[in-house]
């Protein structure tokens, strides 16, 4: 007999950089089965399951080729497949990689200071003040075994206490005397 296997793999050009922000892909979740079937998907389709992959699924998915099976079991191409759209981000990958490098350096430097036993993670977000575009977004945690975890999602999913009440006043003065 003949067997077939469907497989897929997402390749991340920069390793774990922004991997969590991009999101994940996989099989259609059971709880969303009807939604996807009504939208023309097949149960074997791979879909975006989180973050950017899920948010922009309808633009990223593309379409499959369509064939006619002839009476002699040959195939006739009826409709070409269409590649999905590319999603262009405002992230500057060179700045992104530099920010990640700086975060790692600063966390490691923290070991040389007293009372930093709990300093295991840091976050950074750089945006263009004129457009609001995000240039770099990063969060890294140093694990107890010395490995690093990407926790970039915390920059948008976690709440933070402000560092100083004076900072708000400083910003307000800056606005007043622009």
Q: Which stretches of residues belong to each language-model region?
A:
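Small/polar-residue-rich segments within soluble enzyme cores
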Residues: 1-84
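Soluble periplasmic/extracytoplasmic beta-strand elements of cell-envelope proteins
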Residues: 3-5, 20-24, 88-90, 123-127, ...
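Generic detection of long, well-ordered alpha-helical segments
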Residues: 11, 46, 88-96
């Amino acid at each position: 007999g003949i067997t077939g296997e469907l497989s897929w793999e997402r390749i991340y050009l920069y390793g774990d950089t922004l991997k969590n922000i991009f999101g994940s892909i996989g099989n259609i979740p059971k709880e969303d089965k009807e939604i996807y079937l009504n939208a023309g998907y097949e149960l074997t389709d791979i879909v975006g399951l989180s973050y950017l992959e899920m948010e922009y699924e309808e633009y990223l998915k593309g379409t499959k080729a369509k064939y006619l099976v002839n009476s002699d079991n040959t195939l006739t191409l009826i409709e070409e497949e269409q590649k999905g759209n590319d999603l262009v981000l405002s992230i500057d990958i060179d700045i992104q990689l530099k920010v990640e490098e700086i975060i790692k350096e600063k966390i490691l430097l923290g070991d040389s200071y007293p009372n930093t036993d709990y300093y295991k993670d840091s976050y950074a977000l750089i945006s263009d003040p004129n457009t609001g575009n995000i240039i770099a977004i990063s969060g890294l945690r140093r694990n107890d075994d010395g490995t690093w975890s990407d926790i970039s999602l915390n920059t948008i999913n976690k709440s933070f206490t402000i560092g100083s009440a004076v900072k708000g006043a400083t910003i307000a003065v800056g606005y007043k005397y622009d």
